[in-house]
Amino acid sequence: MNLFTEIRTLVTAELGAMTEAGDLPAGLDLSAVAVEPPRDPAHGDMSTNAAMVLAKPSGKPPRTIAEALATRLAADPRISSAEVAGPGFLNLRLRPAVWQGMVATILQAGDTYGRSTIGAGQKVNVEFVSANPTGPMHVGHVRGAVVGDALARLLAYAGWNVTREYYINDGGAQVDVLARSAFERYREAHGLEPEIREGLYPGDYLIPVGEALKAKYGDSLLDKGEQHWLTEVREFATEMMMQMIREDLAALGVEMDVYSSEKALYGTGKIEAALDRLKEMDLIYEGVLEPPKGKTPEDWEPREQTLFRSTAHGDDVDRPVKKSDGSWTYFAPDIAYHYDKVTRGFDQLIDIFGADHGGYVKRMKAAVAALSAGRVPLDIKLIQLVKLWKNGEPFKMSKRAGTYVTLRDVVEQVGTDVTRFVMLTRKNDATLDFDFDKVLEQSKENPVFYVQYANARINSVLRKAREQGMDVSDATLATADLDRLDHPAEIALIAKLAEWPRLVEIAARTNEPHRVAFYLHELASELHGLWNRGNDEAGLRFLQDDPVVSQAKIALARAVGVVICAGLGILGVTPVEEMR
């Protein structure tokens, strides 16, 4: 049950009644009418912009509309007051019984409270991580993996049919570098000195690959030239790296539904098919691009190339898809890959890219818009950097030097749950500080602890109540005398719980799972605030001498626990029942 949707339905019904009464003209578009929490809680429980958005199309002053609407709304038994503010905003206060009833609603719904059907079963593809298969995942990949997986969980929670997908970048030059690096470890496995030349991957993680190559091929490759072993070693090393990456993802609680290979696009006609489709729309041509201003990108040539007319779909410049020597640019297989996703019948595509792919956003959106005839929206989320801190100092990494911090390093030091939660404590496009010391602190400054501690406190109340012989099942607590929850601090906590279904829908529509983490922190803050006030005001404690009052307060605590557990589930974090 979404209380905000319920009150919006009331508002639009009264606007319809005003139309029938001749107070408003017929045919008004009510889609922009919103009901939401006011910016300042002192102004009321909810606020609506109805009068503001209808003033111009109705030809009436907004305050005139607001005053007439306020009179009608105040007559509803759920509304205690409706006050016009400013130029025509309408602030509403709900009767305590509405809030008190929310506790029973939550307990009756259980883990379905907040679930939504706004996705309507639409098929959405969330592509994330897609790290080059050249080594273990590092901390930079962790954030994208967590954001992508949490987003997939959120969308499924809100009614979408979600596919998690990993695009294996195994068609470029980097996998040849991997093969050459692995071959040196193969030589090392035979007792020879490896030649880790400039540009090769020096990490020790390739030593097991060299040993595995030795086990499979013996010494048969040692005396052969690169042209004889490159393909086999590349495929062997790539598969071992992907197995390592799958294990890394599993350690983070991430499981992909589909793994797609870039290499599979070559030689199968898929790239040609995608570009032929664009050519049919007159979006492929031969031409010479003007030299770009500033830094010259690697796909620019001062000669004729095959170009995609991406400017026809919002890009700044047209983009090369085939070089003058006949080879494909990096963009060409990406177009083919996204065309493949379109032809698989997805209604929506989401890509989670690193911040260094910012220049790819417009061209990729242009390609999908063209290939789907505007039917399939593509949302690209850019993941900013993670800055590591340890012992109060920045901790830097270098992949080329083989000294980077891996996903396993992070998970082994702080755990999967802490890692996942912290990675969602900032919006994806903001740099995130990950302090190995602070994320394990038991203090209110640590958001992971703060939320988990709230859940642990709730469970401590339930345990004590059981020890006293109380039935604390959801079904029984839902029948409590909830009128006893009449303190403003208790009502404020319930009001925060009432925001959960609305928050889920907003987060899902905007593809922003960090909103869930932010909300959980706010909810935990309300719970801790009420708990701490109980230290000084005995009447606010969750366990009371009066069993009727006690049952009502325990019902409230349990309702908070239901929502916290639901939110943590979306984040992929296991709720803690007891702090140790």
Curated annotation (Swiss-Prot):
One GO process term, biological-process aspect: arginyl-tRNA aminoacylation
Q: Which GO terms describe its molecular function?
A: arginine-tRNA ligase activity; ATP binding
Which gene is this protein's source?
argS
Cytoplasm as a keyword? yes
The Gene Ontology CC terms held by the record are: cytoplasm
Gene3D superfamilies listed in its UniProt record: Arginyl tRNA synthetase N-terminal domain, HUPs, Isoleucyl-tRNA Synthetase, Domain 1
- What species is given as this protein's source? Cereibacter sphaeroides (strain ATCC 17023 / DSM 158 / JCM 6121 / CCUG 31486 / LMG 2827 / NBRC 12203 / NCIMB 8253 / ATH 2.4.1.) (Rhodobacter sphaeroides)
Lineage from the top down? Answer: Bacteria, Pseudomonadati, Pseudomonadota, Alphaproteobacteria, Rhodobacterales
Name of protein = Arginine--tRNA ligase
Q: Which InterPro entries match?
A: aa-tRNA-synth_I_CS, Arg-tRNA-ligase, Arg-tRNA-synth_N, Arg-tRNA-synth_N_sf, ArgRS_core, DALR_anticod-bd, Rossmann-like_a/b/a_fold, tRNAsynth_Ia_anticodon-bd
